[in-house]
Design a protein with these regions (language model features):
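OB-fold and OB-like single-stranded nucleic-acid-recognition modules
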Residues: 1-216
């Protein structure tokens, strides 16, 4: 029902986490609020509510539209940038990035954590985040601007990386035995911004889909 609502009223946002396959409009704890619908248009939010009520959702005794600072980045200052000196993957999959001070990409950070694990010394990055009491910055968005990558052997269709068998010999997959031309490939990482999945974002965090949109 929430998927149908999202499709019918596309200006509503953050209704669902497609990765976790769950709705984000209902509270996680017991409370008198049935659901909260966020959107760019007041009228679409009200229409989406009426749609849910007509389609069999639990009946509400009343409703109201509020203007809030959710999904606006109201808690963040300007973007920061720096050069990676080293990284360290900690227990649990959290990643520590040293850029003169410490950036933390938690395992729950999804694409932010995935990019953090691939960073190498010399990479130029940009980020948004909040500083904790220890001075560490908890990353909310991350982007690789420039990064040189070592050449690596290509991957086999089974997922393993081909390995050399010697001079003038084809590469061979150590898992399935498939052979491949003897060559190197360069790993290229996208310079797009990365963000956590909707379930692990702060309420104030602006989704990439809202970047450039006015809050007025």
């Amino acid at each position: 029902l929430v998927i149908e609502m999202s499709n019918r009223y596309p200006s509503t946002i953050l209704n669902r986490d497609p990765n976790a396959r769950r709705s984000l409009i209902a509270p996680r704890t017991p409370c008198p609020v049935l659901y909260g619908i966020r959107g760019e248009s007041r009228q679409d939010v009200l229409d989406a509510h009426e749609f849910l009520q007509e389609q069999g959702a639990e009946k509400s005794s009343g409703h109201r539209a509020h203007r809030t600072n959710q999904a606006t980045d109201d808690h963040l200052s300007s973007v920061s940038s720096g050069v990676v000196s080293n990284t360290r993957t900690m227990k649990g999959g959290h990643v520590e990035i040293n850029v003169g001070h410490t950036l933390l990409a938690f395992s729950q950070g999804g694409d932010v954590n995935s990019l953090a694990q691939k960073l190498t010394p010399g990479d130029q990055i940009e980020w948004y985040g909040l500083q904790d009491l220890d001075g560490n910055i908890h990353l909310e968005r991350l982007r690789l601007i420039v990064g040189e990558r070592n050449k690596v052997r290509p991957r086999c269709g089974c997922g393993s990386r081909f390995k050399s068998q010697g001079t003038n010999q084809p590469l061979r997959c150590p898992s399935c035995g498939l052979e491949h031309d003897n060559l190197w490939v360069t790993e290229i990482l996208s310079s797009e911004w990365r963000e956590p999945s909707p379930s692990y974002r702060r309420h104030l965090a602006k989704p990439l889909s809202r970047m450039g949109k006015s809050e007025v």
